[in-house]
Amino acid sequence: MADTSLVTMVRRNWQRATIALFLIALVAGFAPFGAVASLDKVASYFGHHTSSKSLQSVVGLSGSQLGIGLAVLRLASLGALPLASLADRWGRVSTMRRTLLVGLVITSCAALSPSYWFFVACFALARPLLTSTATVVQVVTVELSNAQTRIDRLVIVSAGAGVGAGLAAIFSGLLRGPESFRWLFALALVPVFFLRPLLRSVPEPVFRGAGGPLARLGAVPQGLRSRVATVGVIVFVIGVVSGPASGFTFVYGEGVLKISPLIVSLVVSLSALTGLAGLLLSRYFARTLGRRGTIVIGTVATALTAALAYGGGKTAFVIGYMSGVLAGGLLAPAIAALSTELFPHASRATAAGWIVVAGVLGAMAGLLVFGLVGDSVHVTGPGSLRLAALVTFLPLLPCLALLYRLPESSQMELT
């Protein structure tokens, strides 16, 4: 059992480049998640409470406004495609440096928001930059690893993204006051001063035979298009589930169920343990069941735990949220591995960009459906969003069978 221990895994893979990629993933996870973590406070500050038994009467903005705002943020992530494609031209490290720097600066501008839609606009401008950074981090992690260490390092990098999102949620709970969200957004400026020394530790991946002619920006070789499309459908389904599963979490927990922000912060902190368990399970399942089986289990678990969180009271929310973090930890490394291992170096970042597009479209669809169904029911308390959860999360799960049209990538050597 020693080989499966957390300490052994970290010690074996904790090199300077891996540490740097972990921290970059943390920062790229922290900045955009501030929009989700503070959404209840933003809605309450900029919205208007009504007397009707609707979501707006509880949180200040309607489900449609919240859903459209979150969908706009997801739509903006489509810009990650050309930005990630630039990594196949400019190089991985140079692209990460530029996109992360600009994305953090724009995120911090949201601290000056005079309205809800200005807040949405700032995060929408920053979102593609930070999404492309996270995408290229996964690509670099895979390219600097071999078949034996790849999933371990993806687990570590996924942990970084999870820690970043968790820190955003914790700070949101600890910062008090109606305008405390402004301080959270301003924190995005802090990492800017450490980017250059951090990125010096990351070597530029080089592959033999990777110096051929470049295709048009965003173009994928014809022989790989069906593979990109299949992975895209899978990621679309994951997006439909994960978009509203995370997007409305804090609105429902703090706004509808009236859970104290400090309690929410405590739940998020404890969820670090379940998230870690999910990452370790992902490492185990990705090697025993393969990437495809792990993705199926993780996606179904995400849908079921989110339905539990939105379908009951405070206890169901806490259990659903914490088990949902476990499901997310189980899913993230496996889908990151599959999305990068199936493609050659020359088009890997571009393919990853198209896969991000599919996830964005899925998340937008999920958020819009969830918001519209949520508006159609009386939001009076526990379980009010149960119907929205079931209608959104469950219908597309059979599409996961398409995974078995793809080759198992766990033992593939990168080209």
Give short role names for the model-derived ranges.
Residues R89-L100, R287-T299:
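Cytoplasmic membrane-interface "Motif A"-like loop-to-helix N-cap segments
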Residues I68-A84, S269-L281:
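Central cavity-lining transmembrane alpha-helices of secondary-active solute carriers
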Residues G60, G91, L112-W117, N146, ...:
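Helix-breaking motifs and short loop linkers at transmembrane-helix boundaries and internal kinks
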Residues R150-R176, P191, V356-L367:
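Glycine-rich segments within core transmembrane alpha-helices of 12-TM secondary carriers
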Residues A35-A37, R225-L279:
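Extracytoplasmic gate region of multi-pass secondary transporters
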Residues L101-P114, V300-G313:
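C-terminal ends and interior cores of transmembrane alpha-helices
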Residues L39-G79, L262:
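Extracellular/periplasmic helix-loop-helix junction of adjacent transmembrane segments
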Residues C122-A159:
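Cytoplasmic helix-loop-helix junction between adjacent transmembrane helices
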